[in-house]
Regions:
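Enzymes that bind and transform nitrogen-containing heteroaromatic metabolites
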Residues: 1-233
Length: 233
């Protein structure tokens, strides 16, 4: 995550020129994680909307209701996607993201070509499922009203067997993962700027966990830090 000096991860500070170098380092790290075997990146609804869908949403009145089968709808179209071993996993509890394709279209190789998977709750409109199926977008359910993070990760692990995933925010989903004790490593790129009062912290509603600082590097005016959870005795 790119952070301000005071530990914020989203806000107006990210658009300042002081953040340009830190942001580019962040993208470089994402590409490195992909090369090291990452199964893809995980983001919450707001981050996916801001980065990829732009707020577009389908007219669900055009779709028939699909019965909510609480099993999995993991599609079989992987052979048609060149980068099908890499996924964009959207934690979208109520199904509010509007995708125009089943892959991420982005010029950055750390994102472009990733096959989209929607992680939903039972609160989703059944017509949204019909829309996803029309777009050949994989989805599965992982909770009634809130996404059960350990359950979602188990389903992904059982179906895709990744080395690891990269969690890329925002603040709300970061907090969910931390509280569920599902954060093994934290990589931060601290930009030389502070944030305003409306900016969001790294972990919203987080909890106390111990980490070990394993790496620090000053790079292009930013500070790169890596933390890992202590190994259990």
């Amino acid at each position: 995550m790119v952070t301000s000096i005071d530990g914020k991860v989203t806000g107006e500070f990210l658009s300042r020129p002081e953040c340009e170098a830190a942001t580019e380092i962040y993208y470089e790290m994402n590409r490195e994680y992909k090369a090291q075997g990452s199964g893809g990146f995980i983001c919450g609804r707001v981050t996916m909307e801001g980065s990829f869908t732009g707020g577009w949403y389908p007219d669900l009145s055009e779709y028939k209701t699909v019965e909510k089968c609480l099993g999995h709808y993991m599609n079989c179209w992987f052979d048609d996607v060149a980068d099908a071993n890499y996924f964009a996993i959207a934690f979208d509890p109520k199904g509010k993201l509007g995708w125009k394709s089943n892959i991420i279209e982005d010029s950055d190789p750390g994102y472009g070509g990733a096959m989209i998977i929607e992680v939903l709750t039972e609160q989703v409109d059944p017509r949204y499922l019909a829309y996803l199926e029309e777009k050949e977008i994989s989805y599965f359910f992982a909770g009634e009203t809130e996404i059960d993070v350990p359950l979602a990760l188990k389903i992904l692990r059982d179906h895709l067997a990744p080395e690891f995933y990269v969690l890329e925010g925002g603040s709300i989903i970061n907090g969910h993962f931390l509280r569920a004790d599902c954060v093994d490593e934290i990589s931060l790129v601290q930009a030389p700027v502070t944030a305003d009062k409306d900016s969001k912290s790294l972990f919203m509603d987080g909890d106390i966990f111990d980490f070990e600082l394993t790496e620090t590097e000053k790079k292009n005016g930013a500070l790169v830090m890596r933390y890992t959870r202590p190994k259990e005795e």
